[in-house]
């Protein structure tokens, strides 16, 4: 292993762009925005040994690989292990969810790779740890350009407002308290996917940026939201609910922040999801250890600002990170409450299965630590078909048109990154 001062080493993106083009399987997990507690490490990893494509229960299959993971001689949260994603639809292995809608594209339930080359950036310590063979890396060159052309849209304004109205009937009838309904745009894509990531990291820097490449499939995201982190048997999650756009200037920005924090609708929705997160952690944590040390504060990103809370607990000794995954998946912030009923309503009202949207992207470390972000604010590229996808939380007093515009606010950075309006 080599150690370098971060000031003498190229940025994670500059290094990754030299690596990505030479390998079919590679990943960049980059922290470049948001609060320091979320943005400490960046990880570059690639594999010369292929990857795992999972068409069955991801937790059962990944558990079979945990015992064989080799600990890498590097500090930080990721000490070698598995990097990848889990699709939203994998929840059917853990909850009784109806199977009514077609897939938008052909995605497996999960894909993971075990990297044999790893570079870790510790932004707090100012060091770069290299556990990789860089002799096989070719020249860097420039990032290519790309072209997109509109393909289709799932749930236009009228259709989305209609399903929001239908979901309000479920809420008023007492079936659920909240449901998160999503919609998407798709485009025909040609060119260099890395250019999308380059644009996105400039437009919408976030603590959970990622670029995962599995041959002809890519997940390119700038998620603000952690699904969970396990570090030394402490489990953390940071539910986000309640959103406003950023203001044109400081005065307008503060006005929108105060409007958000004074909104009874947004606060009620947020508290509901904090309770859901507490309940999820309670399934796998030692009784009495689940706490909310920070309740309802605002975090600001390039295009939006959110209400956030922190929920923690101590993991029971008989459980591991994959148990935490199945207990928390999918996040209440992308499904609703109660979760199983909300997800069945999603399956009824949305036009397609979600695939990797609203699933999870991250890693399981060989020492038992793990970190997964929610796959939102993400472009999903499957061969030539590019999808951008966003949802809004519907509660008792939701206005259908306002919820439509919330999805558009959440899509704004992605639309800018791919050059569409």
Swiss-Prot record:
Record entry for activity regulation: Cooperatively feedback inhibited by tryptophan.
Keyword Metal-binding: yes
Keyword field contains Amino-acid biosynthesis: yes
Binding-site positions, Mg(2+): 269, 406
Enzymatic reactions: chorismate + L-glutamine = anthranilate + pyruvate + L-glutamate + H(+)
Pathway terms, separated by semicolons: Amino-acid biosynthesis; L-tryptophan biosynthesis; L-tryptophan from chorismate: step 1/5
EC code: 4.1.3.27
Class of this enzyme: lyase
GO molecular function (one): metal ion binding
One example of a Gene Ontology biological process annotation: L-tryptophan biosynthetic process
Binding note for cofactor: Binds 1 Mg(2+) ion per subunit.
Record text on subunit structure and interactions: Heterotetramer consisting of two non-identical subunits: a beta subunit (TrpG) and a large alpha subunit (TrpE).
Primary role: Part of a heterotetrameric complex that catalyzes the two-step biosynthesis of anthranilate, an intermediate in the biosynthesis of L-tryptophan. In the first step, the glutamine-binding beta subunit (TrpG) of anthranilate synthase (AS) provides the glutamine amidotransferase activity which generates ammonia as a substrate that, along with chorismate, is used in the second step, catalyzed by the large alpha subunit of AS (TrpE) to produce anthranilate. In the absence of TrpG, TrpE can synthesize anthranilate directly from chorismate and high concentrations of ammonia.
PANTHER family, A to Z: AMINOBENZOATE/ANTHRANILATE SYNTHASE (PTHR11236), ANTHRANILATE SYNTHASE COMPONENT 1 (PTHR11236:SF9)
Protein name (database record): Anthranilate synthase component 1
